[in-house]
A protein has these predicted regions:
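N-terminal hydrophobic targeting/anchoring segments and the immediately downstream early-domain regions
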Residues: 1-124
Length: 124
């Protein structure tokens, strides 16, 4: 029955470089998780660097992970027995006041943006 369901963790957080998940997580029924991408409060360059590192890590078959940007990719990850990683951030500071940066982050795979957080930003 769980194999037919989608189990998604709504907020996984990595303070430093994201290095993957434990074997216990790999063995769980988790389908995907929203990952708060490290570097979100350090500006666009740091965030892009960390996103690249997450893609590189997920490219390793031993990671058991796949960055997912669409429902089709989520279904593909599930079919392959991988856990989907949905990239996002909790603090939109790195967008500054630029729709161009938001578009660039979307192209890099960011799919979740929390509009406000603990500190004031350009959005709220």
């Amino acid at each position: 029955m769980l194999s037919d369901m989608y189990v998604i963790d709504g907020c996984a957080f990595a303070e430093e470089d994201f290095t993957g998940v434990t074997q216990k997580v790999k063995d769980s029924p988790l389908t995907a998780f929203f990952l708060t991408t490290p570097g979100e409060d350090q500006g666009m360059l740091a965030l892009a660097h960390n996103i690249g590192g997450i893609y590189n890590m997920a490219d390793d078959p031993a990671s058991g992970l796949m960055v997912v940007r669409t429902i089709a990719e989520l279904e593909e990850a599930k079919a392959q027995g991988k856990i989907g990683v949905i990239l996002g951030f909790q603090n939109p500071h790195c967008i500054e006041n630029s729709l161009e940066k938001l578009r660039a982050l979307y192209e890099l795979g960011i799919r979740v943006v929390q509009m406000t957080y603990n500190k004031a930003n350009y959005i709220g």
